[in-house]
Amino acid sequence: ESTDGWNNAGTGHAGYCELNYTPETAEGVEIDRALSINANFEISLQLWSSLVKTGELPAPNQFINPTPHISFVWGEKNVAFLRERYSKLSQHHLFKEMEYSEDFAVLNQWMPLVMTGRDTSVPVAATRISHGSDVDFGSLTRNLIASLESNEQFNLMVSHEVTDIERAKDKRWDVRLKNLETGKSIVISAANVFLGAGGGALPLLQKSGIPESKGYGGFPVSGQWLVCQNDEAVKRHHAKVYGKAALGAPPMSVPHLDTRIINGKPALLFGPFAGFTTKFLKKGSRLDLIKSIRPNNLVQMMDVG
């Protein structure tokens, strides 16, 4: 579900504009996580480039498009934070092309829709990396699967739900699948099982029973997003603009105004508007949260609350 184009912001988590990757500590702004995340994104770019060359992925503009990444803040304290963040990140070769400005006129050129009607007496600042990207992970995933389907050893099973994962005596994994159309179940033996980081991962991790699953909990804070496909508005904004979340607020609360190119059509994604749901997936059960509570994750759940 998370790979669908509209179910993520499409930054690729490059670390250019996501301010929660550079937390402010007693020693100042910490940049190590942003550097690590960006290095991983560069590896993803290299992989995709290689797959394009071998014909396993289509032309890059079918799933990734150049889009500037901008971090924007207001207020003296936040401006000081962004100034320090820029000072530290721009010294690293991965971020050497980052631009910084506190000039209202410059920011108006970078993101006119964001600056329109804003109080010019309030201190503002922004950083921009022009070589950022908008990634349509839905298109990327569909094309990767289409390529994998040419391999006889690959089998994609849709309309199936994993209902249990057990360690077998031979140290392999017995994975029980339920066909949601017929109701029938089968068991597949696998040497390795990989769980993605989507909404359905926690219940599967808990079913595996591995020691590392203990202590994890899910608190499904939701964000409602709106989409603008008005051509005139879309033409006036070409960037991914990220704000700064309030102290203690989850990353989901970071305000966005994102250029999106989904299935080749430009649009604007903006939000979030706070919400709450006990579902872990869009089409999940309202009991997902309750069913995930264990004695070993009660402390973590209470800390979130």
Which functions belong to the PLM regions below?
Residues 15-17, 178-180, 273:
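Generic beta-structure capping elements
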Residues 1-5:
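Glycine-rich FAD pyrophosphate-binding loop
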Residues 17, 77-79, 163, 200-201, ...:
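Short, solvent-exposed loop/turn segments at secondary-structure junctions
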